[in-house]
Amino acid sequence: MSSSVYESIIQTRASVWGSTASGKAVVDSYWIHELGTGSQLVQTQLYSDSRSKVVLWLYCKVGIFPVKKKRFLSQHVYIPIFDDIDFSINIDNSVLALSVCSNTVNANGVKHQGHLKVLSPAQLHSIESIMNRSDITDRFQLQEKDIIPNDKYIEAANKGSLSCVKEHTYKIEMCYNQALGKVNVLSPNRNVHEWLYSFKPNFNQVESNNRTVNSLAVKSLLMSAENNIMPNSQASTDSHFKLSLWLRVPKVLKQVSIQKLFKVAGDETNKTFYLSIACIPNHNSVETALNITVICKHQLPIRKCKAPFELSMMFSDLKEPYNIVHDPSYPKGSVPMLWLETHTSLHKFFATNLQEDVIIYTLNNLELTPGKLDLGERTLNYSEDAYKRKYFLSKTLECLPSNTQTMSYLDSIQIPSWKIDFARGEIKISPQSISVAKSLLKLDLSGIKKKESKVKEAYASGSK
């Protein structure tokens, strides 16, 4: 996609920043670079909320492979072990991409945090606690684009009601190589033979509030725009690594244990991979612990790659990416067209009387305040968010799952007056012009009442 599209997505997501009712819903983005070369070892996005927890850990010293029979895998591998999450691994010439997505995840309206780190095999000396960007690029061989996003993306976030300016200095912190994410919940170990250097932007704004963010948060928004909302992890296969991912998912999955030692057909760089998956359900707390480990090891000497190779591994019963597949739990007949026509007419009437957009469905878990619109013959109840946007939500639509599959399903119904915004995770209706509204003012309420009676008759006959 073009940069202008990314700017639009960033502005849209910035406008709903932190609109979830739970302040614990957050996307943490991490960029880990190699000391000496500045090359990127890992970029990852980890989603967590009050129940979903994710931890990722990268090691560069991988040790010895477990004893397993080695296999060659080529092109596409389908392993149906999960029926309720989308889990896939893709390996090409130099990148391994790992993606885990559950329909319990709603990344609309969450806050973003960015974390820039450099991995070192030894502790460095003479590192100042505060450094500017030019010193960081010289000392750690990073490029400026690794540290800060382009100005146009910062401007897009500011148009979306955030407050961000480019920082000039960064606080440098050092620790042993350890897990990233919700470590306090899942508590993996740490590696005392490798060091992580973190670069934290220093705010240069005199006054800050909950809309004030640093540039790495905007970089995280950009990464989510590029990933199409689906958090994933990518690791460079140009060197040894061990990537471990711990997840706590708020649903019960079936117990699974898989170990595979394999090479990729067509890979002339002579790399060996090891994959371990352990899925441990807990029926009492209605959650599942999912542990995934991928090891990449080069069999020296490393030969220069002569031919491209690719391997995709799908571990889900879903035949399509989870963000576009239609959940069979709600077929198209689940929302009657007569009901949709009735409520769409009411929504249009309400929007026209207010002369502003009305949101009729949202994925965002917002804190709303009630309001009333007196129309003489009747009073309509609605809701407002903190930004005075109007909501006229339906209990019937709220019964559908709050995820992007529902958005895709509602989009497929093709109601002409609906404006579906996948980036914001909402559906809205715009008002008609005032001249049209006046001509229809006397007709709408009586027509709506007639349609409501038809709906009641239809439901009554269907329940018999």
Swiss-Prot record:
Pfam families the record matches: Tospov_NS-S_N, WIV_2
Signal peptide interval: none
Keywords (A to Z) from UniProt: Host-virus interaction, Inhibition of host innate immune response by virus, Suppressor of RNA silencing, Viral immunoevasion
InterPro entries membership: NS-S_bunyaviral (IPR004915), NS-S_N_bunyaviral (IPR053928), NS-S_WIV_bunyaviral (IPR053929)
Biological process annotations from GO: symbiont-mediated suppression of host innate immune response
Residues in coiled coil: none
SUBUNIT field: Interacts with host MYC2.
Task of the protein: Multifunctional protein that plays two independent roles: viral suppressor of host RNAi (VSR) and viral inducer of host attractiveness to insect vectors (VIA). Acts as a suppressor of RNA-mediated gene silencing, also known as post-transcriptional gene silencing (PTGS), a mechanism of plant viral defense that limits the accumulation of viral RNAs. Also inhibits signal transduction by the phytohormone jasmonate, making the infected plant more attractive to aphids, which are the second host to play a role as a dissemination vector. Acts by binding to and inhibiting MYC2 transcription factor.
Membership in a protein family: Belongs to the tospovirus NS-S protein family.
Name the record gives this protein: Non-structural protein NS-S
